[in-house]
């Protein structure tokens, strides 16, 4: 299916690009999330009329994410978790736990924005975590996992 992207989509394209994707991806994800429209003549004409407005909205989102990234970048989050004597946690620290701790510090972060490439944190200590505020704004946050010995 040919679609017009209404915003930047990771690994697909930028605003205004006409790309071919699988029908299910377009119908079930991109179109319902208002990230794309079918590439018909009418949709292309309407897109060209709204292009400046959509670019302005995209620039505002990027500016807001950059401002939040400057505040959030380099910050440290402390999370207390029960741990054994050897420093391994009983359970793990997930992206939801990190997002919750960031929200308590006053940052608007969702769990889907926290990236843990090696999976949940299972050891006591400091860990570098990436937070993706926008497709172009990714900041590093230090998570200090403090073990409460049982």
Swiss-Prot record:
GO terms for molecular function: rRNA binding; structural constituent of ribosome. InterPro entries: Ribosomal_bL9 (IPR000244), Ribosomal_bL9/RNase_H1_N (IPR009027), Ribosomal_bL9_bac/chp (IPR020594), Ribosomal_bL9_C (IPR020069), Ribosomal_bL9_C_sf (IPR036791), Ribosomal_bL9_N (IPR020070), Ribosomal_bL9_N_sf (IPR036935). It comes from the Bacteria. The keyword Magnesium does not apply. It holds the Pfam family Ribosomal_L9_C. Keywords: Ribonucleoprotein, Ribosomal protein, RNA-binding, rRNA-binding. Gene3D superfamilies: Ribosomal protein L9, C-terminal domain, Ribosomal protein L9, N-terminal domain. GO terms for cellular component: ribonucleoprotein complex; ribosome. GO terms for biological process: translation. PANTHER family: 50S RIBOSOMAL PROTEIN L9. Binds to the 23S rRNA. Belongs to the bacterial ribosomal protein bL9 family. This is Large ribosomal subunit protein bL9. It comes from Paraburkholderia phytofirmans (strain DSM 17436 / LMG 22146 / PsJN). The lineage of its organism: Bacteria, Pseudomonadati, Pseudomonadota, Betaproteobacteria, Burkholderiales. The gene is rplI.
